[in-house]
Amino acid sequence: MGSADPQNAAELERAWGRSLYRWWEFYNHEYLRDALRRPLLQLGDAAQRLGEWDSALRRITISRQHICSDSWTDVLDTLRHEMAHQYVWEVLQAHAEDPHGEAFRLVCRKLRCDPAATARRVNPERTENDPVELRIARLVTKLLSLGDSPNEHEAQAAVNKAQRLLLEYNVDLVDSDAERGFERRQLGQVKGRHPAWELWLAMILNEFFFVEVLWTRSYDAARDLEGTVLEVYGTVTNLAMAEYVHAFLSNVLERLWSGYRQEQGLSSNRERMRYFAGVLQGFHGKLGLQRADLQASVETEALVWQGDERLQSYYRYHNPRIQTRQTGGVAASEAFRHGVEAGRRVTLRPPIESATGFGGYLYSGSGER
């Protein structure tokens, strides 16, 4: 658990229990119209079994290791899975049916959870088993590596080609109505309040990297902190790219600010958030111009991205009630304006290639300035 103090560890586990109960009550009200009676919720020591419903004791058990090792999104998926078992047993009273039979699967759909959520996930990077997605990932990685060329025009041409390849891949998926699976994952930290630069980063992923995004309620179990976190939805390939871009840009912001602060002789970090927002606004504008140039260069409308209705349906299925909020923006200080200029010079660098082609990220100090 990472806590050397048994008293602190016990207090943290009690906090986990309170959070699980709050989410149980929310799902029971939101999806099941308060059909369930409150069960006993406890933490367990199983490593492979993430959760369990015990009908005799009216008890749902969630693995401690699951909470420590996996995202809160996965923990809540397990909780809803066990609530589905509880519903089948206590409300439908389908005692003779197979535990994962038709009634159970229908309740899982009602609760928006994975029918197979209780066995330890071995996240087998799906692109390894999909030659098309693996080829796309590796080609994009190769093209981004060409973006390191000292010849500015060659570098930009390589990055443009990578963007076109991703666009062609996604347009072809939608136009051919190819079978494709969607997933969701969380990026960044759970926070009570997110600064403007994080909102710009989410907008960049949504508008240019073929994923749907949502600031969703979540919980950081290690810090006992409730707040919101960025959740992205898409195909495995697009999620891998979005995760890479998120990590790359977050890393670049810190490095650019460090250099800018030294150049300007700034003694504090007071302008740091404004500078970050400026960089990402500038990078957002650069990507918009690049996409416009790409659209103008094609002779047909075949490469115009109209969105993915299947992805939007998946997104709406998991989020039946979505609220949109407006933000107040950022005061245009000198640091913000300098950040915009720096953002227009940012270029994506190649990830460290893994089996999927998007394993980690590299940073080139000369490429962003």
Describe the predicted segments one by one.
Residues 33-34, 55, 91-129:
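Post-HExxH zinc-binding segment in Zn-dependent metallohydrolases
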Residues 5-58:
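Auxiliary, metal-adjacent structural segments of Zn-dependent hydrolase domains
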Residues 51, 111, 115-121, 125-134, ...:
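Extended, helix-rich structural scaffolds rather than catalytic motifs
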Residues 148-150:
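Short coil turns that connect the paired helices of HEAT/ARM alpha-solenoid repeats
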Residues 60-79, 91-98:
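Short pre-active-site segment immediately N-terminal to the catalytic Zn-binding motif
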Residues 155-160:
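Short, charged, amphipathic alpha-helical segments
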